[in-house]
Amino acid sequence: MKITEFLNNKKGASGIGTLIVFIAMVLVAAVAASVLINTSGFLQQKAATTGKESTEQVASGLQVLQIMGVHDSSNITKLAVYIAPNAGSSAVDLSQSVVTLSNGDVKSIFKYDTTDAAADKSYGAVKTGGSLFAEATLNISNMTNTQFGIIVIQDADGSCKAATPVLNKGDIVAIVLNLNETMTEPRTAITGSIQPEFGAPGIISFTTPATYLDGSTVVQLQ
Protein backbone atom coordinates (compact mmCIF):
# COMPACT_ATOMS: atom_id res chain seq x y z
CA MET A 1 0.00 0.00 0.00
CA LYS A 2 2.79 2.40 0.94
CA ILE A 3 4.71 1.48 -2.21
CA THR A 4 1.67 2.32 -4.34
CA GLU A 5 1.24 5.68 -2.64
CA PHE A 6 4.95 6.43 -3.13
CA LEU A 7 4.78 5.68 -6.85
CA ASN A 8 1.63 7.74 -7.26
CA ASN A 9 3.33 10.75 -5.66
CA LYS A 10 6.33 10.62 -8.08
CA LYS A 11 5.87 12.98 -11.01
CA GLY A 12 8.05 13.38 -14.08
CA ALA A 13 10.02 16.58 -14.41
CA SER A 14 8.39 18.89 -16.93
CA GLY A 15 8.00 22.53 -17.79
CA ILE A 16 10.15 25.42 -18.98
CA GLY A 17 12.72 24.98 -16.19
CA THR A 18 13.56 21.49 -17.30
CA LEU A 19 13.84 22.64 -20.91
CA ILE A 20 16.28 25.40 -19.91
CA VAL A 21 18.44 22.91 -18.00
CA PHE A 22 18.43 20.53 -20.98
CA ILE A 23 19.40 23.29 -23.43
CA ALA A 24 22.14 24.45 -21.08
CA MET A 25 23.56 20.93 -20.94
CA VAL A 26 23.52 20.69 -24.74
CA LEU A 27 25.28 24.06 -25.08
CA VAL A 28 27.97 23.09 -22.56
CA ALA A 29 28.55 19.83 -24.40
CA ALA A 30 28.77 21.69 -27.73
CA VAL A 31 31.28 24.20 -26.36
CA ALA A 32 33.37 21.40 -24.87
CA ALA A 33 33.31 19.51 -28.17
CA SER A 34 34.33 22.66 -30.06
CA VAL A 35 37.27 23.24 -27.71
CA LEU A 36 38.40 19.64 -28.10
CA ILE A 37 38.16 19.81 -31.89
CA ASN A 38 40.11 23.09 -32.06
CA THR A 39 42.75 21.76 -29.68
CA SER A 40 43.05 18.57 -31.69
CA GLY A 41 43.47 20.55 -34.92
CA PHE A 42 46.11 22.81 -33.38
CA LEU A 43 48.07 19.86 -32.01
CA GLN A 44 47.89 18.09 -35.37
CA GLN A 45 49.26 21.15 -37.19
CA LYS A 46 51.94 21.61 -34.53
CA ALA A 47 52.98 17.98 -34.84
CA ALA A 48 53.14 18.24 -38.64
CA THR A 49 55.27 21.40 -38.43
CA THR A 50 57.58 19.88 -35.84
CA GLY A 51 57.92 16.73 -37.93
CA LYS A 52 58.84 18.74 -41.02
CA GLU A 53 61.37 20.82 -39.10
CA SER A 54 62.89 17.69 -37.58
CA THR A 55 63.15 16.03 -41.00
CA GLU A 56 64.82 19.12 -42.46
CA GLN A 57 67.17 19.32 -39.48
CA VAL A 58 68.23 15.70 -39.94
CA ALA A 59 68.48 15.74 -43.75
CA SER A 60 69.86 19.25 -44.20
CA GLY A 61 73.50 20.09 -43.90
CA LEU A 62 76.84 20.08 -45.66
CA GLN A 63 79.35 17.43 -46.62
CA VAL A 64 83.07 17.97 -47.15
CA LEU A 65 84.21 16.43 -50.44
CA GLN A 66 87.94 17.15 -50.19
CA ILE A 67 90.42 19.67 -48.82
CA MET A 68 93.36 21.17 -50.71
CA GLY A 69 96.09 23.41 -49.34
CA VAL A 70 98.91 25.64 -50.55
CA HIS A 71 102.19 25.75 -48.61
CA ASP A 72 105.22 28.04 -48.55
CA SER A 73 107.70 25.27 -47.70
CA SER A 74 107.04 25.57 -43.97
CA ASN A 75 103.29 26.15 -43.41
CA ILE A 76 99.92 25.79 -45.11
CA THR A 77 99.04 29.35 -46.10
CA LYS A 78 95.80 28.83 -48.03
CA LEU A 79 93.07 26.25 -47.65
CA ALA A 80 90.24 25.22 -49.97
CA VAL A 81 87.44 23.05 -48.59
CA TYR A 82 85.19 21.59 -51.29
CA ILE A 83 81.63 21.26 -50.01
CA ALA A 84 78.19 20.26 -51.28
CA PRO A 85 74.74 19.95 -49.69
CA ASN A 86 73.79 16.61 -48.15
CA ALA A 87 71.47 14.37 -50.14
CA GLY A 88 67.92 15.58 -49.53
CA SER A 89 69.11 18.78 -47.90
CA SER A 90 67.14 21.98 -48.12
CA ALA A 91 68.93 25.09 -49.39
CA VAL A 92 71.92 26.22 -47.31
CA ASP A 93 72.75 29.92 -46.95
CA LEU A 94 76.53 30.15 -46.66
CA SER A 95 76.36 33.76 -45.51
CA GLN A 96 74.88 32.41 -42.26
CA SER A 97 77.44 29.62 -41.91
CA VAL A 98 80.48 29.59 -39.64
CA VAL A 99 83.82 27.86 -40.23
CA THR A 100 85.97 26.81 -37.27
CA LEU A 101 89.52 25.45 -37.28
CA SER A 102 91.68 24.36 -34.37
CA ASN A 103 95.12 22.82 -33.89
CA GLY A 104 94.52 22.14 -30.21
CA ASP A 105 96.16 25.38 -29.09
CA VAL A 106 94.62 27.99 -31.39
CA LYS A 107 91.01 28.13 -32.53
CA SER A 108 90.02 30.35 -35.45
CA ILE A 109 86.50 31.33 -36.51
CA PHE A 110 85.72 32.46 -40.05
CA LYS A 111 82.59 34.14 -41.43
CA TYR A 112 81.48 35.32 -44.85
CA ASP A 113 81.52 39.07 -45.46
CA THR A 114 78.86 40.07 -47.98
CA THR A 115 80.30 43.60 -48.18
CA ASP A 116 83.66 42.33 -49.40
CA ALA A 117 81.88 39.84 -51.64
CA ALA A 118 80.04 42.65 -53.40
CA ALA A 119 83.44 44.22 -54.11
CA ASP A 120 84.66 40.86 -55.52
CA LYS A 121 87.11 40.41 -52.64
CA SER A 122 85.75 37.17 -51.22
CA TYR A 123 83.71 35.63 -54.03
CA GLY A 124 84.75 34.13 -57.33
CA ALA A 125 84.19 31.33 -59.80
CA VAL A 126 86.55 28.90 -61.49
CA LYS A 127 86.45 29.23 -65.25
CA THR A 128 87.21 26.32 -67.59
CA GLY A 129 90.91 25.58 -67.28
CA GLY A 130 91.30 28.05 -64.43
CA SER A 131 93.18 27.56 -61.18
CA LEU A 132 91.46 27.49 -57.82
CA PHE A 133 94.25 29.35 -56.03
CA ALA A 134 94.97 31.87 -58.79
CA GLU A 135 94.66 35.48 -57.65
CA ALA A 136 92.56 36.11 -60.76
CA THR A 137 89.97 33.66 -59.42
CA LEU A 138 89.90 35.11 -55.92
CA ASN A 139 92.39 37.39 -54.21
CA ILE A 140 92.82 35.17 -51.17
CA SER A 141 95.88 37.07 -49.95
CA ASN A 142 93.75 40.16 -49.31
CA MET A 143 91.29 38.25 -47.13
CA THR A 144 91.59 38.57 -43.36
CA ASN A 145 92.12 35.54 -41.13
CA THR A 146 88.58 35.91 -39.76
CA GLN A 147 86.65 35.59 -43.02
CA PHE A 148 86.20 32.90 -45.63
CA GLY A 149 85.77 33.26 -49.35
CA ILE A 150 83.62 31.29 -51.77
CA ILE A 151 84.69 29.97 -55.16
CA VAL A 152 81.88 28.46 -57.22
CA ILE A 153 82.79 25.15 -58.86
CA GLN A 154 79.37 23.94 -60.00
CA ASP A 155 76.10 25.86 -59.88
CA ALA A 156 73.70 25.07 -62.71
CA ASP A 157 70.87 27.34 -61.55
CA GLY A 158 73.03 30.28 -60.46
CA SER A 159 71.75 30.21 -56.87
CA CYS A 160 75.16 30.88 -55.30
CA LYS A 161 75.68 34.61 -55.79
CA ALA A 162 78.08 37.02 -54.10
CA ALA A 163 75.39 38.73 -51.99
CA THR A 164 73.26 35.60 -51.50
CA PRO A 165 75.50 32.50 -51.55
CA VAL A 166 72.85 29.77 -51.38
CA LEU A 167 73.66 26.13 -52.05
CA ASN A 168 71.07 23.68 -53.28
CA LYS A 169 70.98 20.28 -54.98
CA GLY A 170 73.92 19.66 -57.27
CA ASP A 171 75.96 22.70 -56.23
CA ILE A 172 79.66 22.45 -55.37
CA VAL A 173 81.75 25.31 -54.02
CA ALA A 174 85.14 25.74 -52.38
CA ILE A 175 85.36 27.53 -49.05
CA VAL A 176 88.76 29.26 -49.13
CA LEU A 177 90.71 30.45 -46.09
CA ASN A 178 93.76 32.66 -45.62
CA LEU A 179 95.37 30.85 -42.71
CA ASN A 180 97.29 31.97 -39.69
CA GLU A 181 100.64 30.25 -40.30
CA THR A 182 101.08 29.29 -36.65
CA MET A 183 98.28 26.73 -37.06
CA THR A 184 99.74 24.64 -39.85
CA GLU A 185 103.28 23.58 -39.09
CA PRO A 186 104.26 20.04 -40.22
CA ARG A 187 102.59 17.09 -38.46
CA THR A 188 99.85 19.28 -36.99
CA ALA A 189 96.40 17.75 -36.41
CA ILE A 190 93.71 20.15 -37.59
CA THR A 191 90.03 19.74 -36.71
CA GLY A 192 87.02 21.90 -37.40
CA SER A 193 83.69 22.20 -39.13
CA ILE A 194 81.56 24.23 -41.48
CA GLN A 195 78.37 24.80 -39.49
CA PRO A 196 75.31 25.92 -41.49
CA GLU A 197 72.44 27.83 -39.92
CA PHE A 198 70.37 24.63 -39.89
CA GLY A 199 71.42 21.03 -40.28
CA ALA A 200 74.54 18.93 -39.91
CA PRO A 201 77.99 20.49 -40.21
CA GLY A 202 80.66 19.49 -42.70
CA ILE A 203 83.53 17.94 -40.75
CA ILE A 204 87.14 19.04 -41.23
CA SER A 205 89.83 16.67 -39.95
CA PHE A 206 93.35 16.24 -41.32
CA THR A 207 97.02 16.22 -40.35
CA THR A 208 99.46 18.47 -42.16
CA PRO A 209 102.27 16.69 -44.07
CA ALA A 210 105.48 15.70 -42.32
CA THR A 211 107.44 17.78 -44.84
CA TYR A 212 106.55 20.34 -47.49
CA LEU A 213 108.15 19.66 -50.87
CA ASP A 214 109.34 22.68 -52.83
CA GLY A 215 108.40 21.10 -56.14
CA SER A 216 104.68 20.80 -55.27
CA THR A 217 103.05 23.69 -53.47
CA VAL A 218 99.48 22.32 -53.66
CA VAL A 219 98.71 19.31 -51.46
CA GLN A 220 95.60 17.27 -50.78
CA LEU A 221 94.85 17.17 -47.06
CA GLN A 222 91.50 15.38 -46.76
UniProtKB/Swiss-Prot annotation:
Q: Which residues form the propeptide?
A: 1-12
Which Pfam families did the record assign? Arch_flagellin
Coiled-coil region(s): none
What is any one GO biological process for this UniProt entry? archaeal or bacterial-type flagellum-dependent cell motility
- Keyword Transmembrane helix in the entry? The reply is no
Subcellular location as annotated: Archaeal flagellum
Give UniProt keywords alphabetically.
Archaeal flagellum
Q: Which GO terms describe its molecular function?
A: structural molecule activity
Q: What is its main location?
A: other
Q: Which domain of life is it from?
A: Archaea
- Carries keyword Chaperone? no
Q: Which InterPro entries match?
A: Flagellin/pilin_N_arc, Flagellin_arc
One Gene Ontology term, aspect cellular component: archaeal-type flagellum
Its function, per the record, reads: Flagellin is the subunit protein which polymerizes to form the filaments of archaeal flagella.
Member of which family?
Belongs to the archaeal flagellin family.
The identity of this protein, by name, is Flagellin B2
Lineage per the UniProt record: Archaea, Methanobacteriati, Methanobacteriota, Methanomada group, Methanococci
